[in-house]
């Protein structure tokens, strides 16, 4: 369903394009051998090149090139065998060279696509305009001293992939889905860790609005360096409504760069939006054009892992899962692997229900990650086995799972220790059934008179009297025979 904002003069739609800066996983920077470890002491991972010392020549890091190509292939994009690095000229204190080495009109990766997984199980394709490599800038720190700012150049020269979408997104929710899917692909490819809280994935959102039915692309504003998916969505929503208010009051939108204030939930003007000519792009004279062989690309392609879309299709075909469940499970590589371990040789639907239900809930409740879960895949699989062989009822299994989260013990151990084994002894179950029937003659008569839904109530009473240990199927069968004959 289309996302429409109702204004005073009519209905409006949002047009959104996203630029994502993804920090490349590499032990060294794009043009120097300095380390890239997050959280190091300020200015301890800086080479003369990163600090902009005169006469220092950049040397391309082949690993970063491989990572860019790998990402491009993961986005089903065209790999350009010849690309050019250009100088993007601007002054800022944390850019000691006085320019950023980037790529302009000849990027390493051309057009591609990304498939959004929609909440209703459907999909939508978003175009990728390009991916190019560039240096990150340093970091300005303004909150360490009341009257001074400090510069940390550890980040200066770190390799970034700027991934630019086409203006195909139409709602804050779609923007969130796009970022979630892109982060998933990058993590599967192991080209970026996607940790937005550490700044290794940052987003600029380009936002404009137009009347519903129009195909015109109106003036856009760019919201810079938003560092969480939720904030990106909030920023887009606010900015779109600001545009509509301006248009409906007879004004015009000025193309500009804006910042998002996450405390106030609003954007504010940062500077007028620069155009390409403002940066005086020209090919970097210290770097030859980057020429790669098709065999280099083919070698990387042959080593690509199974990506989320392919894994989702396989989960649907192999395990019989619906599109939504498969999409949730493959969103993170670790959750897909966890599910496959649990489901191996077992009822895949039951495995899916347990992983997406109780197990995911336990992660939220304990604050643990799937890499260090409160219940291992092996133990969850064993719990499913105990349900299947009749040792545990569904209700007892829930209790055992809670104990597994609490103690970390295997389900078989807990069943033995706590005497939680399901009662399948006919004599014991029959005694419990007889007791409930004899205590409720009025309800027995109602069942005989046709109110068969009450059989469920009788089952509940028997389960209660046996502390959930009776086999529900045996209880149901016995009640039906004894009451209805």
From Swiss-Prot:
Domain of life: Bacteria
Entry's Gene Ontology molecular function annotations: asparaginyl-tRNA synthase (glutamine-hydrolyzing) activity; ATP binding; glutaminyl-tRNA synthase (glutamine-hydrolyzing) activity
GO biological processes: glutaminyl-tRNAGln biosynthesis via transamidation; translation
Summary of subunit composition and partner proteins: Heterotrimer of A, B and C subunits.
Cited PANTHER family: GLUTAMYL-TRNA GLN AMIDOTRANSFERASE SUBUNIT B MITOCHONDRIAL AND PROKARYOTIC PET112-RELATED, GLUTAMYL-TRNA(GLN) AMIDOTRANSFERASE SUBUNIT B, MITOCHONDRIAL
UniProt similarity note: Belongs to the GatB/GatE family. GatB subfamily.
Role summary: Allows the formation of correctly charged Asn-tRNA(Asn) or Gln-tRNA(Gln) through the transamidation of misacylated Asp-tRNA(Asn) or Glu-tRNA(Gln) in organisms which lack either or both of asparaginyl-tRNA or glutaminyl-tRNA synthetases. The reaction takes place in the presence of glutamine and ATP through an activated phospho-Asp-tRNA(Asn) or phospho-Glu-tRNA(Gln).
Protein's name in the database: Aspartyl/glutamyl-tRNA(Asn/Gln) amidotransferase subunit B
Gene of this entry: gatB
């Amino acid at each position: 369903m289309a996302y429409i904002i109702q204004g005073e003069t009519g209905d409006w739609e949002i047009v959104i394009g996203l630029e994502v800066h993804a920090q490349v996983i590499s032990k060294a920077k794009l043009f120097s051998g300095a380390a890239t470890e997050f959280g190091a002491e300020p200015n301890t991972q800086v080479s003369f090149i990163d600090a902009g010392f005169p006469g220092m020549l950049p040397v391309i890091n082949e690993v970063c090139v491989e990572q860019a190509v790998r990402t491009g292939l993961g986005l089903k994009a065209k790999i350009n065998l010849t690309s050019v690095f250009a100088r993007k000229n601007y002054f800022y204190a944390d850019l000691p060279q006085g320019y950023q080495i980037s790529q302009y009109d000849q990027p390493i990766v051309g057009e591609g696509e990304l498939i959004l997984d929609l909440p209703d199980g459907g999909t939508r394709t978003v175009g990728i305009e390009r991916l190019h490599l560039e240096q990150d800038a340093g970091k300005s720190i303004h909150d360490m001293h009341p009257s001074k700012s400090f510069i940390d150049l550890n980040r200066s020269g770190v390799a970034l992939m700027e991934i630019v979408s086409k203006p195909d997104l139409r709602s804050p929710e779609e923007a969130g889905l796009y970022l979630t899917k892109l982060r998933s692909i990058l993590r599967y490819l192991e080209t970026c860790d996607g940790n937005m809280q550490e700044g290794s994935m940052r987003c600029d959102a380009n936002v404009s609005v137009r009347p519903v039915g129009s195909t015109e692309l109106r003036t856009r504003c760019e919201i810079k360096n938003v560092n969480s998916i939720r904030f990106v969505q909030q920023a887009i929503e606010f900015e779109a409504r600001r545009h509509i208010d301006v248009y409906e009051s007879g004004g015009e939108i000025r193309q500009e760069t804006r910042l998002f204030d996450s405390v106030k939930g609003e954007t504010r003007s940062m500077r007028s939006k620069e155009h390409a000519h403002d940066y005086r792009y020209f090919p970097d004279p210290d770097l030859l054009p980057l020429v790669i062989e098709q065999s280099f690309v083919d070698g990387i392609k042959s080593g690509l892992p199974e990506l989320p879309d392919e894994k989702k299709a396989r989960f649907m075909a192999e395990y019989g899962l619906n599109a939504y469940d498969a999409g949730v499970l493959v969103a993170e590589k670790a959750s897909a692997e966890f599910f496959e371990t649990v489901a191996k040789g077992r009822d895949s639907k039951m495995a899916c229900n347990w992983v997406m239900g109780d197990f995911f809930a336990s992660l939220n409740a304990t604050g643990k990650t799937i890499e260090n879960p409160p219940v291992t895949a092996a133990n969850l699989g064993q719990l499913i086995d105990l349900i299947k062989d009749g040792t545990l009822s569904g209700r007892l299994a829930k209790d055992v799972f809670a104990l597994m989260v609490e103690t970390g013990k295997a389900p078989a151990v807990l069943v033995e220790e706590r005497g939680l084994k399901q009662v399948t002894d006919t004599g014991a179950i029959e005694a419990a059934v007889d007791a409930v029937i004899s205590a409720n003659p009025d309800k027995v008569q109602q069942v005989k008179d046709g109110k068969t839904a009450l059989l469920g109530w009788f089952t509940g009473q028997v389960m209660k009297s046996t502390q959930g240990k009776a086999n529900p199927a045996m209880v149901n069968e016995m009640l039906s025979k004894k009451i209805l004959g």
